Amino acid sequence: MQAIKCVVVGDGAVGKTCLLISYTTNAFPGEYIPTVFDNYSANVMVDAKPINLGLWDTAGQEDYDRLRPLSYPQTDVFLICFSLVNPASFENVRAKWFPEVRHHCPSVPIILVGTKLDLRDDKQTIEKLKDKKLTPITYPQGLAMAKEIAAVKYLECSALTQKGLKTVFDEAIRSVLCPVVRGPKRHKCALL
């Protein structure tokens, strides 16, 4: 069985842990608990191939900036996550997460993931954003960011409703099984 290491990064509270727990247990977790590191493992079938998907959660908070890259070696694919209802987390894809991932792993495929899809059309959430003169991130904005950072895919999902959730991980696996070759040959991440 082929093993694939998938590392999930993004700002604190964008829903990385919920994404992983909802996917691996089919249940949405309760309270927000900041993550230091957690690993999940899932045996899945994608395109009739059995895969052992190793899922690595990371802490988005700045306190962990020096610790987080320790989970990067041998990564096969990164999920860079942002919340569709948190424009600052979207900007940090460009400002922080893409540069960090590319610095440590120059050729590992990236999938850009917009989380909390269920809240994009939520009236209360829209009002809260409006009070701050903000709006949710749109699908075209996400696509444009994915193109800018040369992500292999842009996907949106909800860990709460599970809409689009399985697709995120299926596409992460496909990005490793069927790589889109862009420029130099892809190598696994190695820290020197």
UniProtKB/Swiss-Prot annotation:
It is a lipid-anchor. Keywords: Cell membrane, Developmental protein, GTP-binding, Lipoprotein, Membrane, Methylation, Nucleotide-binding, Phagocytosis, Prenylation. It comes from the Eukaryota. One of its GO terms (molecular function) is GTPase activity. Its main location: membrane. Pfam families: Ras. GTP binds at residues 10-17, 57-61, 115-118. The modification Cysteine methyl ester is found at C189. GO terms for biological process: actin cytoskeleton organization; actin filament bundle assembly; actin filament organization; aggressive behavior; cell chemotaxis; cell projection assembly; cortical cytoskeleton organization; defense response to bacterium. InterPro entries: P-loop_NTPase (IPR027417), Small_GTP-bd (IPR005225), Small_GTPase (IPR001806), Small_GTPase_Rho (IPR003578). A motif (Effector region) lies at residues 32-40. A lipid is attached at C189 (S-geranylgeranyl cysteine). Residues 190-192 form a propeptide. GO terms for cellular component: cell projection; cytoplasmic vesicle; cytoskeleton; plasma membrane. It is found in: Cell membrane. Involved in integrin alpha-PS3/beta-nu-mediated phagocytosis of Gram-positive S.aureus by hemocytes. Interacts with Pkn (via N-terminus). This is Ras-related protein Rac2.
